[in-house]
Amino acid sequence: MSSIFKVAGVTATLLVSLSATAQIGEPFIHDPSTVMKCDGKYYTFGTGGGGLISDDGWSWHGGAVRPGRGAAPDAVKIGDRYLVAYSATGGGLGGSHKGSVLTMWNKTLDPSSPDFAFTEPIEVAWSEDGDDCDAIDAGLLLDPIDGRLWLSYGTYFGFIRIVELDPATGARIEGNTPVDIAIDCEATDLIYRDGWYYLLGTHGTCCDGPNSTYNIIVGRSRNVTGPYLDKLGRDMLKGGGKMVIAARDNMTGAGHFGRYVEDEGVEKMSCHFEADFNRGGMSVLAFYPLLWNDGWPVAGEAFREGTYEIESERRGYALELCVDFQRMEGGKHRFWEPVTEPLQPLKTQTLDVVIGSWSDGDINVRIGDYMFRPHQKWTITEVPEAGGYLTSPYYKITIEGTERALAATPDAEVITVPQYTGAPEQLWRIEQLVDGTYRIMPKEVPGHDGNLVLMSIADSTPTLGEYDFNSDNCKWRFRKP
């Protein structure tokens, strides 16, 4: 394990250019804890003490405070307090596997708050040289069903174990005996969903920059103490595990999983990549949508700029301008007549052919059959100066080849305006949901508090309304034209 990395003098312009998948700012960290939100800000802690803070979940910088140094912390909120666990030595550091896991409390994670004060750490797990488990790499789970608190820990140098803690004190429950639940992984995390307990572990080689093969695997169980089986039924206690995420997006060494539930059906996963090739091989904090496929977690894809069809999940129609449909000439062949001449490709309809018939002012939008026409092609572009949200920057959505922008209105409708201005009602939040569809949300709706999303109120009618994950009206897909 190594300390948090910090780099000075990197310009914002450079970081924006590298921001397709990892966070911007200075997101340099190793072994990040599960992300916690406290008083409107986001926090994560890492190996070596300290950690990162973000005002919006997109731009990160140093400043989080965690005493004790050590390695591989985790955090959980219990009531109105935060419990932080971390490891002192162990993990083969300095050639020793003697270590301990400690827990401590704080009322707030904001180091500038007068209430900021960590309690004295309590030892809850330990190991000696020669033991078959390494007391390092803490993972915390507060069971949402019965309120019990669990700690997983361990590395490649033996078993992964689970032990029960007291959620009132953070101490180990007296007489509780650790249970072996996995081998051949480390940096474990426990989560619960829909009647299943999931054990996320980090598999592969660590701490070798661009050569690190770290990847995140998972098994699940009906019982928190196991057995944890992968999708093929292999026990993680015998080396099983299903892949969640590995190297991607020019980054290697995915490790130290964390889950963040934003809303019903909106989940994010955090991890580090041991080497971001676009940032000189630095270890960075990264986020991805967390998808659930047949009861198994898998990392989604970071949304990318481009030109798309925006398709409603309700019926499969596409978002389009309310303009007259202009027919194309040619290409009509009587199917019963023989082909007597070589066939030539048809050219698609181009913007210059139709734009002269469009209004110069605001144009409403509707949903209709997709015909890859200019009034149905939307270019989605990052707006880095507008900030962002957990995982991504805000985007502008314009008709391809124009500055005609999708915008929210004071009466909670959607229109297009002739010119993008950067107004908050023209900025959009795009988030992949756990089923692989997306929700599309304006940064602001003039005169409205709270969040509204783009939805299909009828097969052909888009509007803004309350988000409901259980309704296809709120879901969209992006397809390349």
Please report, for each region that a protein language model flagged, where it lies by residue.
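Beta-rich carbohydrate-recognition and catalytic domains
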Residues: 22-136, 142-185, 192-245, 264-306, ...
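Conserved positions at the start
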Residues: 29-32, 70-72, 135-137, 185-188, ...
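Signature of short aromatic-glycine-proline-rich micro-motifs recurring in repeat-based ectodomains
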Residues: 139, 247-261
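Lectin-like carbohydrate-binding module/patch detector with strong preference for beta-trefoil
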Residues: 305-481
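Short, surface-exposed charged micro-motifs
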Residues: 33, 74, 139, 189, ...
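Short, surface-exposed coil-to-beta transition loops
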Residues: 253-255, 283-284, 449-451
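Bacterial N-terminal signal peptides that target proteins for export
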Residues: 1-9
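N-terminal signal peptide c-region/cleavage motif recognized by signal peptidases
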Residues: 17-19
